From Swiss-Prot:
Modification type Phosphoserine: residues: S36
Organism: Homo sapiens
Broad class of where this protein is predominantly found: membrane
SMART domains: RGS (SM00315), S_TK_X (SM00133), S_TKc (SM00220)
Enzyme active site: D316 (proton acceptor)
Protein name: Rhodopsin kinase GRK7
Length: 553
């Protein structure tokens, strides 16, 4: 007799894996859709031109398409091009591995800067003062200081005349066309939906693919009726707003927010490699190799610091919320419990997961802030090494009250053979009972990345994505439960929506998120394709000036 559940799972997995293959981007259907796309005409950009803020950091550094077009513009003016090339050389030096190559690059930069500004000088964007410093530099420290000054001057130069000329150029016109294209309405027709990957309190998470680019994402579908019945609207909106503010390679990105008839949808980074909890307990011997522990911990620390810099406390750090991508890099996910520090005011509301909550969260009416995340980080590093949490053994049955008392009173023990001295030390420091004694919180400049546990990690290269992960997930494996194991939600009855609800849904559905959307457009080749003046198109003449999308989405 055929097992229909197993058959359904096989079909769902096969379709999902097929969609994930890079070759799928070459499908005839995808190419047909892309031929039917065109950028909006310039005449439709007049209002946007008036509204858009001319902020250099946003336009030319943060937004990928703006950055790309600004770079292309600089290449058309010799003086501007030299400044841009110099900054690229500085970045390459900063990201180079320590050794003779990096030393040689530094000396080359100093020599480049040492020429005094004069007619015909190849570095007119640098001052005489910087040239003099470079000429006088004899030690490595002096050379680094001189190049740092030169970098600042080159950046300041680009923000003046080059930027002014850029925003009156055809390159900026093209940017406006892309911004208008970015602002098109988004609905469920924009995506192809694949298998369910999991579920949460208000709905399910499924894999989706953008029809026009082939890009795969995870879509968190929040049931509107369930949200209203459980009073979850505020939490959902807070998670969305926090995700919109965060742009970090170590935190899942929000790419789209839209509504369907029944759901509010958050479309985010698809992490195909599973979560760290799965890898700790379900792949080989419990626990992870130390090389993986160090690598993941370094990326987690970077993500945590990015949140803290934005005034956000994560409050739900645990291996289950750390997801791996196709290449083996990890990102923090599920920001549903994250909270913004309003004016630096501490928080008192209890939130988190048992076994990872810091003592100050567990104590009644005690305020807390960023240090709680470092405590949970200590719990997570311990778990990655030992295959158990610090205050509860693997599969041990412990009441919430007992676990609370252990967290408040017990000193952490290191009985697992895999603990190195560095791992023990960083766990002890993260698991300090008092937040003011905790690593990352002892003083303003207390940076966990400086701990000797991370001595093998070059953090600038890590942040630039230049370090190869120690483990790469198997691309032929679906790291998710069988669809039969994912519970269905019961129907929510007796919930009606009023005008206030409908307005909330409308406000929630803001469409594409600029940075993530622009990254998708460049990554999938659509940027080059739509910018090509010679490309064949399936649009009728004149359609592009009206909508920018000739094919119904």
């Amino acid at each position: 007799m055929v097992d229909m559940g197993a058959l359904d799972n096989l079909i769902a997995n096969t379709a999902y894996l097929q969609a994930r293959k890079p070759s799928d981007c070459d499908s005839k259907e995808l190419q047909r859709r892309r031929r039917s796309l065109a950028l909006p005409g310039l005449q439709g950009c007049a209002e946007l031109r008036q509204k858009l803020s001319l902020n250099f950091h946003s336009l030319c550094e943060q937004q990928p398409i703006g950055r790309r077009l600004f770079r292309d513009f600089l290449a058309t003016v010799p003086t501007f091009r030299k400044a841009a090339t110099f900054l690229e050389d500085v970045q390459n030096w900063e990201l180079a591995e320590e050794g003779p190559t990096k030393d040689s690059a530094l000396q080359g930069l100093v020599a480049t800067c040492a020429s005094a500004p004069a007619p015909g000088n190849p570095q007119p964007f640098l001052s005489q003062a910087v040239a003099t410093k470079c000429q006088a530099a004899t030690t490595e420290e002096e050379r680094v200081a001189a190049v740092t000054l030169a970098k600042a001057e080159a950046m300041a130069f680009l923000q003046e005349q080059p930027f002014k000329d850029f925003v009156t150029s055809a390159f900026y016109d093209k940017f406006l066309q892309w911004k208008l294209f970015e602002m098109q309405p988004v609905s469920d027709k924009y995506f192809t939906e694949f298998r369910v990957l999991g579920k949460g309190g208000f709905g399910e998470v499924c894999a989706v693919q953008v029809k026009n680019t082939g890009k795969m994402y995870a879509c968190k579908k929040l049931d509107k009726k369930r949200l209203k019945k459980k009073g979850g609207e505020k939490m959902a909106l807070l998670e969305k707003e926090i995700l919109e503010k965060v742009s970090s390679p170590f935190i899942v990105s929000l790419a789209y927010a839209f509504e369907s008839k029944t759901h509010l949808c958050l479309v985010m980074s698809l992490m195909n490699g599973g979560d760290l909890k799965f890898h700790i307990y379900n792949v080989g011997t419990r626990g992870l190799d130390m090389s993986r522990v160090i690598f993941y911990s370094a990326q987690i620390a970077c993500g945590m610091l990015h949140l803290h810099e934005l005034g956000i406390v994560y409050r739900d750090m645990k291996p289950e919320n750390v997801l791996l991508d196709d290449l083996g890099n990890c990102r923090l996910s599920d920001l549903g419990l994250a909270v913004e520090m309003k004016g630096g005011k501490p928080i008192t509301q209890r939130a988190g997961t048992n076994g990872y909550m810091a003592p100050e969260i567990l104590m009644e009416k005690v305020s807390y802030s960023y240090p709680v995340d470092w405590f949970a980080m200590g719990c997570s590093i311990y778990e990655m090494v030992a295959g158990r949490t610090p205050f509860k053994d693997y599969k041990e049955k412990v009441s919430k009250e007992d676990l609370k008392q252990r967290t408040l009173q017990d000193e952490v023990k290191f009985q697992h053979d895999n603990f190195t001295e560095e791992a023990k030390d960083i766990c002890r420091l993260f698991l300090a009972k008092k937040p003011e004694q905790r690593l990352g919180s002892r003083e303003k400049s207390d940076d966990p990345r400086k701990h000797h546990f991370f001595k093998t990690i070059n953090f600038p290269r890590l942040e630039a994505g230049l370090i190869e992960p120690p483990f790469v997930p198997d691309p032929s494996v679906v790291y998710a439960k069988d669809i039969a194991e994912i519970d269905d939600f019961s129907e929510v009855r007796g919930v009606e929506f009023d005008d206030k609800d409908k307005q909330f849904f409308k406000n929630f559905a803001t469409g594409a998120v600029p940075i993530a959307w622009q990254e998708e457009i460049i990554e999938t080749g659509l940027f080059e394709e739509l910018n090509d003046p010679n490309r064949p198109t399936g649009c009728e003449e004149g359609n592009s000036s009206k909508s920018g999308v000739c094919l119904l989405l």
